[in-house]
């Protein structure tokens, strides 16, 4: 299982929180102090909490669990998509649509529409339409791909959420809470840790920090999946004997 050291976190700037005037008092247990009116996160808390989260994500993925990566702010968007693709998982990296989890039935219909449009764009259907109709469908396809492309093959609700910025993604966290889906989240000094099952106190803005978290999670999920495949192979080998 991938682990992250304190040195890695220091180099990535994980310890830099937000300005002291924007703090959430619920984050006090994870704050070391302040420097130049910026809160400093206590990495002696972050390191074990992150590694505990990785261990749990490894267990979930080794049971074929589906992990949904969520990070819709611009700084995290591309990194979230890359990490999810790296470990064959799922992502929402533009806008969280209200009801994405709690109203899955409706979302599923939109995903079906997205897949239908994808087929139409490839099988020549668009070519038979008027220019205006083809343009309208092309725009609809792009819009659906933008919002649902990362979950179109999820095939049902995820088994866990990994969230960059608990404050920014509070709607996603609330929906997961309502459905009993465990939430793993990077929680900065300005955020509310309530509703997060596995709190990872850390900088949620610096791209180096965000890339560090996502890289470790993707590697852990890949390893967890390979454990699952290895145990399946072992079982089939025993059966064959």
Curated annotation (Swiss-Prot):
The keyword ATP-binding does not apply. One of its GO terms (cellular component) is cytosolic small ribosomal subunit. One of its GO terms (molecular function) is structural constituent of ribosome. It comes from the Bacteria. It holds the Pfam family Ribosomal_S2. Belongs to the universal ribosomal protein uS2 family. This is Small ribosomal subunit protein uS2. It comes from Enterobacter sp. (strain 638).
């Amino acid at each position: 299982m991938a682990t992250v050291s304190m040195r890695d976190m220091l180099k990535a700037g994980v310890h830099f929180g937000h300005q002291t005037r924007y703090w959430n008092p619920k984050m006090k247990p994870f704050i070391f102090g302040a420097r130049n009116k910026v809160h400093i996160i206590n990495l002696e808390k972050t390191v074990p909490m992150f590694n505990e989260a990785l261990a749990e994500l490894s267990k979930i993925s080794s049971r074929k669990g589906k992990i949904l990566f969520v990070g819709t702010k611009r700084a995290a968007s591309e990194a979230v998509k890359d990490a999810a693709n790296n470990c064959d998982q799922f992502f929402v990296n533009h806008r969280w649509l209200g009801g994405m989890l709690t109203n899955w039935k409706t979302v599923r219909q939109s995903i079906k529409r997205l897949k239908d449009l994808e087929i139409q764009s490839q099988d020549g259907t668009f070519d038979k339409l008027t220019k205006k109709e083809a343009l309208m469908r092309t725009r609809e396809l792009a819009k659906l791909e933008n919002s649902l492309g990362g979950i179109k093959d999820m095939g049902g609700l995820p088994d866990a959420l990994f969230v960059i910025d608990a404050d920014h993604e509070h709607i996603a966290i609330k929906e997961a809470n309502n459905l009993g889906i465990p939430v793993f989240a990077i929680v900065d000094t300005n955020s509310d840790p309530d509703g997060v099952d596995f709190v990872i106190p850390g900088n949620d803005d610096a791209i180096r920090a965000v890339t560090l978290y996502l890289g470790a999670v993707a590697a852990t999920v890949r390893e967890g999946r390979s454990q699952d495949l290895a145990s399946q192979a072992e079982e089939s080998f025993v059966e064959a004997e």
